[in-house]
């Protein structure tokens, strides 16, 4: 009889072991929130099965990563949500390109939706800096509705932690120093017309109706506080409309933004302290600006000075051009300056040169005490 019971037990264990991770973990174990939220950005693996995603997540989960900001279609994101059920406390965020639409077949079918620079070049045809910069105009009602509908398609996903807006801005009117000097070999000592966007006819008409003149009538439109504030408002109102719809769906809204408010406003017309976000992820990529690690503290402190923790501040760090020791220091500086969490761009880069161990050290120090 004991042999029969033992055999039956082994059969049950075997059946359990071959079940997909999602089937084995239907009920999530309640877990405490991390004191310091740790996360990664990355692209989805379009061909990955749920079980292979579970295996991919394993080393990150062991290092304390609990938030995955994944870029892919709603159908692809759904597989990551299912895989996350294997790990208590893991959250999936749908990272979406918003105003920039380089590979978006729906948007690309509407050249009239794309933004225009001060020279008059349309972003559909003219590539500022790189070919994957294809900027929609937030002043075109149809483009605006499309961006909101796109966010809604992610918000409809059951189990999603947040809709994560990226490229929710205008083109970089001014690049960081290092990008100017070494990547693009240009000098931007003023707002050059070919990089200064927002001049779509719909935007010009809307501005003209409000102020009685076109920004193009001005000798130096980039110096006009009214034209600056107009563009800030166009993006901010879009975000807040998306926020209202996302929150009505019961989901949170997060966004990847430029480092601190003054820089964000001046360079990409992004006024993120006024946005109705649940999580804000400033990309504190100090190397892009030829700054040292101490600059990260400056950026975090200046961001929090305007947001006062009305939403969670998660400091974004660029992984590929930093040592493991400096990555640890950068994360620690972010947290000690007030950040509620740290995101790493990107997950794949953490698997090199001992960098995932730096994340593990941060998790041990702040979350496992």
Question: Can you describe what each PLM-predicted range is?
Answer:
Residues 93-156:
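Active-site-adjacent "subsite" loops/lids of carbohydrate-active enzymes
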Residues 164, 171, 195-217, 222-266, ...:
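Aromatic-lined carbohydrate-recognition surfaces of secreted/lumenal glycan-active proteins
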């Amino acid at each position: 009889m004991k042999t029969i019971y033992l055999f039956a037990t082994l059969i049950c264990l075997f059946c359990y072991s071959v079940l997909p991770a999602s089937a084995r973990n239907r009920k999530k174990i309640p877990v405490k929130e991390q004191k310091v939220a740790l996360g990664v950005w990355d692209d989805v693996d379009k061909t990955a099965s749920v079980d292979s995603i579970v295996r991919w997540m394993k080393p990150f989960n062991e290092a304390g990563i609990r938030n995955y900001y994944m870029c892919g279609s709603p159908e692809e994101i759904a597989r990551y949500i299912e895989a996350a059920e294997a790990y208590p406390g893991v959250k999936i965020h749908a990272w979406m390109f918003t105003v920039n639409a380089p590979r978006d077949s729906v948007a690309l079918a509407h050249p009239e939706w794309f933004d225009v620079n001060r020279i008059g070049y349309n972003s559909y045809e003219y590539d500022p800096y790189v070919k994957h910069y294809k900027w929609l105009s937030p002043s075109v009602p149809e483009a605006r509705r499309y961006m909101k509908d796109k966010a809604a398609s992610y918000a409809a996903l059951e189990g999603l932690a947040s809709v994560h807006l990226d490229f929710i801005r205008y083109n970089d009117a001014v690049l960081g120093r290092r990008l100017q000097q070494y990547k693009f070999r240009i000098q931007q000592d003023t707002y050059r017309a070919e990089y200064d966007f927002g001049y779509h006819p719909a935007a010009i008409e809307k501005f003209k109706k409000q102020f009685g003149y076109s920004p193009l009538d001005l000798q130096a439109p980039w110096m006009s506080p009214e034209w600056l504030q107009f563009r800030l408002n166009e993006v901010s109102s879009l975000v807040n409309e998306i926020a209202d719809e996302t929150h009505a769906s019961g989901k949170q809204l997060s966004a990847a933004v430029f480092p601190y408010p003054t820089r964000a406003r001046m360079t990409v017309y992004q006024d993120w302290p006024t946005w109705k976000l649940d999580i804000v992820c400033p990309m504190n990529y100090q190397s892009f600006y030829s700054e040292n690690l101490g600059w990260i503290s400056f950026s975090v402190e200046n961001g929090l000075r305007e947001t006062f923790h009305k939403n969670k501040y998660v400091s974004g760090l660029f992984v590929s051009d930093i040592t493991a020791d400096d990555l640890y220091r950068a994360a620690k500086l972010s947290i000690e300056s007030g950040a509620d969490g740290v995101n790493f761009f990107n997950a794949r880069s953490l698997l090199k040169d001992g960098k995932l161990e730096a994340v593990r050290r941060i998790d041990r120090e702040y979350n496992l005490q």
